[in-house]
């Protein structure tokens, strides 16, 4: 791709597959990002906001009860404690500072679970930027607490009634808005996917998750973990955790996609293991698509994982074998959600519950194995309590 400063590809994945009208805008964004990375004033403001507004560094918490009777030590990286309730706040602050640097006067965003929307709304309120959030109508219904939070903080929330009324449709509407208003508007993309330079920007603005984890685990255990585990939808919390450990070959990187009702049912959101390569959302990456290239509907109980593609760096890490990607069903995630609440007094987001469920599987499979695991607890579960309550009530569990 001619004229980019940074490499727009991760192996064969990534790129900038957008209408011609948006190419100069993406190049402007890339230039602003590269300059900001080398600007001590920008970095100082970003770090100050992370520390004094968002509440970094976040804790690394040892599970005291979940691993009883086993030889595993399980730590949780507590992104749920970040202001806004999830890891999303990290990169939102960075992108809004970039937007201001470029002279943009309006922010738009897409959101699935509502966490990125909340993070965008709170940061826009604090940094005094008008904000519009596109959200699938289905997600507006299942994430009503977050919709109220966004509106309370001054964001305009637009329910998207098209297609499957989910995250992919919200992404499409946000792209349409941006294409029409790019001169004044910054599209604050919420995950490590989309056209270049978004996957790189989001990784760089999330990588403090892994950097902090590395320092914290060395201080507590005097060694690196055997594995770090994170849920993967678009992939921002996972790449934020993985980035610092990619060069540490002794550390397994495990990403967890949503198996939904089970891979065999077709109702899942696992394009890495069960999709095929194509062009979607401005990038080349694995997608859930039909044989004639129509995008299939993804499914997960977790709105934030309900996405038919995945960030290109994850596709690359999967292809070269540096990271492994597994899947967890809705039922397994709900069990993990309950277990963490009951035994550790922490209510995780359903997204994070997928990663936790896989960690618990590893522990149960080999209780005598001495292992040190870290799960990225990417968000808190307040937004999911009504969904889980309904399911458990229907099953007669509560």
From Swiss-Prot:
Alphabetical list of Gene3D superfamilies matching this protein: 3.40.50.1100
Gene: trpB
Top-level taxonomic group: Bacteria
Top-level enzyme category: lyase
The protein's name in its UniProt record: Tryptophan synthase beta chain
Enzyme nomenclature, EC number: 4.2.1.20
Catalysed conversion reaction: (1S,2R)-1-C-(indol-3-yl)glycerol 3-phosphate + L-serine = D-glyceraldehyde 3-phosphate + L-tryptophan + H2O
GO MF entry, a single one: tryptophan synthase activity
Cofactor or coenzyme needed: pyridoxal 5'-phosphate
Function of the protein: The beta subunit is responsible for the synthesis of L-tryptophan from indole and L-serine.
InterPro entries: Trp_synth_b_CS (IPR006653), Trp_synth_beta (IPR006654), Trp_synth_beta/beta-like (IPR023026), TrpB-like_PALP (IPR001926), TrpB-like_PALP_sf (IPR036052)
Pathway it works in: Amino-acid biosynthesis; L-tryptophan biosynthesis; L-tryptophan from chorismate: step 5/5
Source species of the chain: Histophilus somni (strain 2336) (Haemophilus somnus)
Keywords: Amino-acid biosynthesis, Aromatic amino acid biosynthesis, Lyase, Pyridoxal phosphate, Tryptophan biosynthesis
Sequence similarity: Belongs to the TrpB family.
Any Pfam family: PALP
Subunit structure comment from the entry: Tetramer of two alpha and two beta chains.
Modified residues (N6-(pyridoxal phosphate)lysine): 88
Any one cellular-component term (Gene Ontology): cytoplasm
